[in-house]
Curated annotation (Swiss-Prot):
Keywords tagged on the record: Cell cycle, Cell division, Cell inner membrane, Cell membrane, Coiled coil, Membrane, Transmembrane, Transmembrane helix
Organism: Erwinia tasmaniensis (strain DSM 17950 / CFBP 7177 / CIP 109463 / NCPPB 4357 / Et1/99)
Matches recorded under Pfam families: DivIC
Membrane-topology annotation of the record: Single-pass type II membrane protein
GO biological process, one term: FtsZ-dependent cytokinesis
Protein name, per record: Cell division protein FtsB
PANTHER family reported for this sequence: CELL DIVISION PROTEIN FTSB
Family: Belongs to the FtsB family.
Principal localisation: membrane
Binding partners and assembly: Part of a complex composed of FtsB, FtsL and FtsQ.
C-alpha cells in the first residue's frame, strides 16, 4: 500500500508541476487569454472603421448630396450663381491670441 501511495503522490506532483510551470500551463493560458482579449478589442475598432467606410460608400453611391458636400469641403467648389466668401482672421488679432507681438 505504501508504494501505491508514493506513486500517486509522485504522479500528483508531476501533474501539478505541469499545470503551473509546464508548457501550456496556467501561465501560458493567461498570456494567450490576454492576447485574445487585446485582439478582440483591435478587431472591434477595425470593424467600426469598416462600417463607417461602408456607410460612406453607400452614401456616395446613393445620392448627389454627399458628392456635392465633399466637392464643397475638400475641393472648394461652388454652384453657378453662388458667391463664395472666405473669412481670413486679422493677422494682428491672431498674433495677439497666440501671445506674439504684431509684426510691422
Amino acid at each position: 500500500m505504501g508504494k501505491l501511495t508514493l506513486l500517486l503522490l509522485v504522479l500528483l506532483g508531476w501533474l501539478q508541476y505541469s499545470l503551473w510551470l509546464g508548457k501550456n500551463g496556467i501561465h501560458d493560458y493567461t498570456r494567450v487569454d490576454e492576447d485574445v482579449a487585446s485582439q478582440q478589442g483591435n478587431n472591434a475598432k477595425l470593424k467600426a472603421r469598416n462600417d463607417r467606410l461602408f456607410a460612406e460608400i453607400d452614401d456616395l453611391n446613393g445620392g448627389s448630396e454627399a458628392i456635392e458636400e465633399r466637392a464643397r469641403n475638400e475641393l472648394g467648389m461652388i454652384k453657378p450663381g453662388e458667391t463664395f466668401y472666405r473669412l481670413v482672421p486679422d493677422q494682428n488679432r491672431r498674433n495677439a491670441q497666440q501671445g506674439r507681438p504684431a509684426s510691422q
